[in-house]
Amino acid sequence: MTISQYFPIYDQLDKADQERLDYAAVKRRVPKGTLLHGGDGVCTGLLVIASGQLRAHMISEEGREITLYRLFERDICLFSASCIMSSLQFDVFISAEKDTELWIIPPDFYKGLMERSAVVANYTSQIMASRFTDVMWLMDQVMWKSFDKRLAGFLLEESVLEGSVGIALLTTFPKY
């Protein structure tokens, strides 16, 4: 398994950039529950997901969390490399919801790739637009949909993600 199989525009890069990317990208396996990017100012790099599931979320000062979007096989996480775009000024956390295999492309390398390649710059803009659309949809849900409709949607989404017809809400019952 190589990054060429999971980075959608790999074949559109010139041979030299393909070789640089092959060398720069670091493959990692991360267990469920791992915090990959913590909004702490550290620029993790671009994440290319080979398998598993990641969650991008924000945490309020009171500790409440909101899921912005999820990432699956062949998805790209750009917000973990937001330092390469000076206009992005918010803290996003990226966590593994399932055991995940991914590549990390160092932020400085990716920034250089964007500067050299119009294809990469355009692709990066497409990712940003897609994530912006996801977040706007979420805002619409939170602001304008009733709680019962949001809960029903959440339960349906969870059943699809888990590949089950039902959802286990309690695994053990409290003893009184």
Give a label for each model feature:
Residues E61-L68:
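Short alpha-helix-to-loop micro-motif enriched in aromatics/charged/Gly
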Residues R70-Q126:
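Cyclic-nucleotide recognition modules
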Residues M1-K32, I76, A81-M85:
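Cyclic nucleotide-binding regulatory module and flanking cytosolic helices
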Residues L156-Y176:
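Phosphate-/nucleic-acid-contacting segments
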